[in-house]
A protein has these predicted regions:
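Hydrophobic pocket/interface hotspot
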Residues: 7-10, 22-23, 30, 46, ...
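A beta-strand edge to alpha-helix "cap/lid" segment located at domain peripheries
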Residues: 1-2, 55-128
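A solvent-exposed, acidic/Ser-Thr-rich amphipathic alpha-helical stretch
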Residues: 27-77
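Short, low-complexity N-terminal intrinsically disordered segments enriched in polar/charged residues
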Residues: 1-28, 127-128
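Generic anion/oxyanion-binding catalytic loop in active/binding sites
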Residues: 11, 39-40, 93, 112
Length: 128
């Protein structure tokens, strides 16, 4: 698989909750950097920690959550994904939409780092 195809597979795995596939395409020491101010925003270290602390946690707080991809930018060992989040908070019933960029670094055919850039205020507003 190309690096772009690996990132496309990552989104498929997240969407379908195929956590085994996610673990296969990430380095064990994956660094997953979510915006400070983002719900559970911090640096998650390790692919297993991302599955537990990020992916599975979405179900606790959100009735729906999506990242709609508008564009992939393939820069070799880095792949940038431009899109927008949309979601509806489970406890408040409020919805939101926020533009975002995801930056992935790959090493030897595996995702080694994720960086997120988004407006976190609209997400917090939906939670309160």
């Amino acid at each position: 698989m190309t690096n772009l195809e690996i990132i496309q597979e990552l989104y498929r795995a997240f969407h379908e909750k195929d956590y085994d596939a996610f673990l296969r395409i990430c380095t064990p020491d994956l660094e997953w950097i979510q915006n400070e101010g983002f719900p559970r925003g911090t640096i998650h270290r390790g692919a297993e920690a991302v599955v537990e602390g990020v992916f599975k946690a979405f179900d606790d707080n959100w009735e729906s959550w999506s990242f709609d991809i508008e564009q992939y930018l393939d820069a070799g060992k880095t792949v940038i994904v431009i899109g927008s989040y949309a979601g509806r908070n489970r406890s408040t019933g409020k919805s939101f939409c926020s533009s975002a960029a995801h930056v992935y670094d790959l090493c030897d055919g595996k995702v080694s780092r994720f960086r997120q850039f988004t407006d976190t205020k609209v997400i917090w507003d939906a939670m309160n």
